[in-house]
Amino acid sequence: MLTVSEYDLLAASLRELAPTGRNGFEGLVQRLISRVTGAEFFLAQSGAQSGRDMSSARTGATIIAVECKRYGKDRELDEDELKGKLLSAVSTIPGLDLWVLAASRPVPDQLYSGLQASAELLNVDVLALSLDGTTDGSLATLCAIEPGLVAAALRDAGVARADAVGSLLSRIQLRPE
C-alpha cells in the first residue's frame, strides 16, 4: 500500500504526461497493457475514436478496447459520457470482449456499477484501472509491473521526478501487500 506522499508523487507525475498520444498517458497505458497481456494494441488517431483510445489486435484472441482518462483530482469522470463510449466501442468493434477504463483518478463505486450494468446488457466485460486515492489502486499496480518503462516515459516527457517514481514502483514490486 502506498503512503499518502507516495500516492501523491505517482498521481502528480502521471498527470504531468500529455493526456493523448504515443508519448502521453495513452501511450504509457498502451505499452503497459501490451506488456501484461502480450497482445498488440493500436492507438486511435485523434478525432472520432468510437469509444476507445486504443484496441487490441482482432485475430483469434480476446478483443480489448481501452479508454484513457488522465484527469486531476478535481475533475470528475462523467458516467453518461463513459457509457456512451462503451456503447460506441461495442457497436464498432465486432466481438469486443472487454472494455477497460484507465483513469488517473479514483473511479467511484456508483460509476463503476453503472458501467458494469451497461456492459452486462451489451454482453461485454468492463474493467477499471485507476488510482483510488488512498491505496495503490489497480493503475499503480499496473505501473509497478514495469517500473523502468514508466520512469522512461516520464523522463522522456520531462517529468522532473521520473527517477523517484521509478524507484517507488520498484519498491512496490518488492512489497506487493
Residue ranges of each PLM-predicted region?
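Mixed-charge (Asp/Glu-Lys/Arg
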Residues: 1-177
